[in-house]
């Protein structure tokens, strides 16, 4: 991949919430998961676990319990990015949040590069959402869902937003 391709994926990534009725094939899903697992992690602990959901009934149940994930009623795929707390960085257990966030962003960028649309829907730290998602996906108590990522072939093409804000950049000191 060229530098421009990476920067293009970053610049063109948008949250896609409407999807075509077209399944995402297993090889493409595996590419997304490989991208997630290529993320950096504190102490290289790689605490992430991914739950891949393609069954319509389960996708609908996830949409039922998450007020901002209603696009799962339409999406053909959900990747729930979770942390196995047994594999967190020793002495600083909350690094899993950064680790799994990096994995999630890699998935979102890979989706863009593969011609897919995706959107990150936060779960943690909303414990009501954590417990509902944990119940639906039968997660063990040592596993915490950080988010659910709806994925599919986009049925919308929202404009790319320029998010550059120079006033938020501070050189050397604040």
Protein language model annotation of sequence segments:
Residues 1-174:
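Acidic, surface-exposed loops and disordered segments
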């Amino acid at each position: 991949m060229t530098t421009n391709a990476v920067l293009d994926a970053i610049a063109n990534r948008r949250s896609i919430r409407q999807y075509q009725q077209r399944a995402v094939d297993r090889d493409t899903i595996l590419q997304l998961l490989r991208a997630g697992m290529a993320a950096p992690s504190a102490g290289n602990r790689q605490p992430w676990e991914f739950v891949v959901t393609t069954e319509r009934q389960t996708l609908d149940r996830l949409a039922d319990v998450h007020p901002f994930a209603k696009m799962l009623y339409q999406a053909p795929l959900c990747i729930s990015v979770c942390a196995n707390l047994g594999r967190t960085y020793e002495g600083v257990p909350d690094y899993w949040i950064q680790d799994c966030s990096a994995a999630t962003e890699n998935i979102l960028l890979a989706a863009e590069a593969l011609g897919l649309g995706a959107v990150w829907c936060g779960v943690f730290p909303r414990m009501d959402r954590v417990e509902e998602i944990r119940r639906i996906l039968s997660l063990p108590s040592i596993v915490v869902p950080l988010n659910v990522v709806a994925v599919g072939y986009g049925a919308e093409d929202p404009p790319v937003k320029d998010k550059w804000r120079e006033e938020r950049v501070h050189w050397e000191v604040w």
